[in-house]
Amino acid sequence: MANKREFPLAKTRNIGIMAHIDAGKTTTTERILYYTGKIHKIGETHEGDSQMDWMDEEKERGITITSAATTAQWKDYRINIIDTPGHVDFTIEVERSLRVLDGAVTVLDAQAGVEPQTENVWRQAETYGVPRIVFVNKMDKIGADFDKSVKSLHERLNANAHAVQMPIGSADTFEGVIDLINMVADIYDEDKLGSKWDTVPIPDQYKEEAEKRRGELIEAVADVDDGIMEKYLGGEEISNDELKAAIRKATLNLEFFPVYAGSAFKNKGVQMMLDGVIDYLPSPLDVKPYVAHDPKTGDEVELMADDKKPFAALAFKIATDPFVGRLTFIRVYTGSLESGSYVLNASKNSRERVGRLLQMHANSRTEIPEVFSGDIAGAIGLKNTTTGDSLTDPDHPLILESLKVPDPVIQVSVEPKSKADRDKMDVALQKLTEEDPTFRAETNPETGQTLISGMGELHLDIMVERMRREFNVDAKIGEPQVAYRETFTKEAEAQGKFVRQSGGKGQYGDVWIDFTPNEEGKGYEFEDAIVGGVVPREFIPSVDQGLQEAMKNGVLAGYPLIDVKAKLYDGSYHEVDSSEAAFKVAASLALKNAASKAGAVILEPIMKVQVTTPEEYLGDVMGSITARRGTMEGMEDRAGAKVINSFVPLSEMFGYATTLRSSTQGRGTFTMVFDHYSPTPKSIQADIIKKRGGEAE
């Protein structure tokens, strides 16, 4: 092997920082980079110069959009940090980063505790089995409540989370933390930007409380660790090392979540949380074997981090970098790869050459000769690779599980101002859809109008802004429209028969198809139940294809038909006149004929909406949610305000920000997250069909 790895695998951590928007995640990441010596000047998100937020749009909006991958060093460990966005419109970025992480730090706002997007990212982390520690940030804020934040983890996430620290003071008096494992106090020097603190005995006024909390921590660990339980019940002393080892084991098994306190903005507590990353989060050697598939045999193959095994990596993000052009972020699972060598893109079965390999720091980069298992790096030169592709040793192809991409829920029309803008827009849309699989662009063949769709208004705003800024496209943007869907609610059988005789060769296709509703989210499923060759083998794929094409345009109002099973069970053919095209048309006719019997309905996206308002405006806010066809899910108190949880159709949420602002004198805030699709009420369905007039035949 030409090069040696710089850090052993056991001393490597691949982590993500996850949070609700505004919980202080970017500031926390900044501080990590500052204390690990990667940056020399601290950037503040709210002043727009944070190191991690490297796209112009992020600098302007003060939110994190793209998961920049950064390498840092703490003590003698390498920590690769993937900065994930906290805004719900960028959920795919969070999914992508979780897919390649080994562990995560969940950042909470000490005043708010668990918020809606925290629930979302926590659930995603559960899906991918990512161990987490929690950092309760903003302890310097008025209303900061560490204990309430820990409680919210239990109540809202059902998480077995326990404090391994206790804050000293809060709001203006927050000056440090008490370590409940080593039973010492870390008190910060205000003048040293957090780079200096004193570890001292626990101040007398906190001793009793600290002893009580350590006892509670030991009890909580005993519940998930038999060895600690035995010692605890036997009244034996439990050493700090034993306690730490038990917490590590339980955290790696997703049975325990250690909680830290701090204020990234005020430079307190970040280093102790970094110690937590090392102490409790996994190295690539600690995670479960990674399951891949052999494309030749279909067999499952388990991958463990090992430099000697054949190379296998996942491309988890494509970015257009101003300096190097197309940059592919990869996570290496096994083996190693030198720059200049060839890899097989096993997902597309094509060879690609990796020109250069880069180690990324927020917005600068270092060229490296080789990457090893467990590494996260940027590759230049991969022309055909897209998000979710598997890159492997050409002699050992493997398919790693790809990413689940959610469907967009909102769309707008984009009209270029001139012919030159049209050409630039085509290039821009191709690049942007490559980078972000939840962003789609399509042109209506009849009207020539281009529609872009995405995960929310902010998502589309940012994409349009990027078209203007990066590709110099001047375009007119239409009103946002809801991405409705259609589905069947009843079983229906129908025949589709297409016969055309007009001199010369005719056309003949005849099918009987049984349509049944599928489970929500299962999509379209096709079953071939033909017996005795009544529809010849070679025409069956055409029936499947004909159905899929027809479903794109729905049966009621031109919206895609989803979650339907189709079983082809009978039909007939003509020796001479039958063709693939004829069976395609026959299938689409069967779908059309089934529509009236299958209880077709239009589905609309329902958003989970959380509104925070001062109590005096509660009546108005609740009235306005009800008026928007919202259903209440519950209410809670938070820092002197009321928090209303509800479900509201997306179509009713346009312009809500303005309504809320005026009805609460600018003091109310809201967040919304896509939750599920639901049938529209009959009157609204009729309106939609009428508006789309003519598209539904």
Swiss-Prot record:
One of its GO terms (cellular component) is cytoplasm. This is Elongation factor G. It is found in: Cytoplasm. It comes from the Bacteria. The keyword S-adenosyl-L-methionine does not apply. It comes from Lactobacillus helveticus (strain DPC 4571). The keyword Nucleotide-binding applies. InterPro entries: EF-G-like_DII, EFG_II, EFG_III, EFG_III/V, EFG_IV, EFG_V, EFG_V-like, G_TR_CS. Its main location: cytoplasm. GO terms for biological process: ribosome disassembly.
